[in-house]
Amino acid sequence: ELLAKLQIDSKKVELVPVEHQLAHASSCYHLNESDEKTAILCLDSKGEYSNIFLGYGENGKIVRIKEFYNPDSLCGMYAALTDYLGFEILDGEFKVMGIAPFGDPDKYDLSELAKFNGKKFKVNNKLIGTVGLRRYKAKSKGHYFSKKLVEMLGPRRVGNLTDDPYVHYAAAIQKLYEDLTIELVEHFLGDVLDASGRLAISGTGSMNIRLNRMLKAHPRVKNLIVHPACGDPGTAIGAAAYVVRKEGKKLQPMKNVFLGPEYTTEQCIEACKLSRERPVWEVLEDPKERAVELLANGEIIAWFQGRMEFGPRSLGNRSILASPDEAEVSEKL
């Protein structure tokens, strides 16, 4: 049905399966391919097999160096603390990341949650990533951590995230996530980075911009490539790119992801007039100046311009903006 809408003859279509992490890897490598060898890191909650992929791309081919499998997941570790801090998994991670700078990462030691000893990366499943009867339960809901974690850290957050100890737990899990990722990259991808300095990353874990900043600042990384649609929707592009490249065809670099619809001022005004909510509208002479004024006064604004971006990131055309001055800004958003 979809193929018919796209005017593609289904009889001429061949279905080619591509592994989840390979699709992630392809999305960040094949669409930014270089003549130099490129280190590849994919951090994911879970795929059909692995959830951490470390490898490299060279001459259009992707080579695996190391993969880790559930329940040993960096994203799973972060998700468990997101759950403990009172947020929904796969939704609240950015709030934890956003509040982390307001805490002291060294006030509480969370290193018992996961360790890398130079060979093995292991998550402590007695504390997090638990399943079945070992899960901590409250109000008939099972959580992604155990009763032992609650005994170690105290009750799951129900109050203000900026309160002690929760704001410091947010800072500590962010630091642990960064430190373990850097250790894995240095151990498994160090030689590739020494050769070219190129690192391409994808997967839901690469939505963590604080981690990305750490990777970009790493002395061995000269060029950091982050696929804009680094979550699962981006694997559609990655899988297609993987198959095309496997056939020997080189792809054009992806210059941007502003691929969606755009609307004129007149269309926006007409939409306001037709809305039952009857929103008040005003045409501004200098929208940027007004936006700065509102942000400085602690307001939250929606920024809307040009074509809609593909993927989960606000890249400037469809963005919710707020000043990061206040510790409560994540809660407000």
Region locations from a protein language model:
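A short glycine-/small-residue-rich loop at the edge of a beta-strand within enzyme catalytic domains
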Residues: 172, 202, 324
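Conserved hydrophobic/aromatic pocket- or pore-lining residues that grip, position, or stack substrates
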Residues: 81, 181, 204
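Short acidic-aromatic active-site loops that bind/stabilize oxyanions
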Residues: 15-18, 159, 163-179
